[in-house]
Amino acid sequence: MVFVNPLANALTSIYNNEMRRNKQAIIMPASKLVINVLRVMQKEGYVGEFEYIDDGRWGKITVQLLGRVNKCGPITPRYPLSYRQMIALPDYIRRYLPSKEIGIIIVSTSKGVMSHKEAARMRLGGVALGYVY
């Protein structure tokens, strides 16, 4: 089995399990980036608790789903965002979110992975990784 983009696999797995009304999703392979993205989603209230399981190969993450994700997915190619672009809400953010009050763009910054709203508050730029609403 080939895993080209672990973040895309994780977000697709969460979305598919939410659409099937499952209470739990198993994500593999696990990575630090996926764990940090899950922390942002947990902080924003989209997923519940998650746990890393070391299986001796890639590792797995079990995520408790709350039924609050309508759509999530990766943003490819990964667009660089400046601080001013996060405030101005450019076209590609409008493309991924239904409105500027609903949903988040997950951004990787120099201070770590966070939502685009938090990055704009901290006046940071970064790279857009994915979206959730």
Swiss-Prot record:
Q: One of this protein's GO BP terms?
A: translation
Q: Does the keyword Cell inner membrane apply?
A: no
InterPro entries for this protein:
Ribosomal_uS8, Ribosomal_uS8_CS, Ribosomal_uS8_sf
The record's section on SUPFAM superfamilies has: Ribosomal protein S8
| GO CC annotation terms, alphabetical | ribonucleoprotein complex; ribosome
Q: Which UniProt keywords apply?
A: Ribonucleoprotein, Ribosomal protein, RNA-binding, rRNA-binding
Q: Secretion signal: which residues?
A: none
Please provide an example of a Pfam family that matches this protein in its UniProt record. Answer: Ribosomal_S8
For this chain, one GO molecular function annotation is: rRNA binding
Extract the HAMAP family matched here: Ribosomal_uS8_A (MF_01302_A)
Under the subunit heading, UniProt states: Part of the 30S ribosomal subunit.
Enumerate the PANTHER family for this protein: 40S RIBOSOMAL PROTEIN S15A (PTHR11758)
What does this gene product do? Answer: One of the primary rRNA binding proteins, it binds directly to 16S rRNA central domain where it helps coordinate assembly of the platform of the 30S subunit.
Q: What is this protein called?
A: Small ribosomal subunit protein uS8
Q: Which organism is it from?
A: Saccharolobus islandicus (strain L.S.2.15 / Lassen #1)
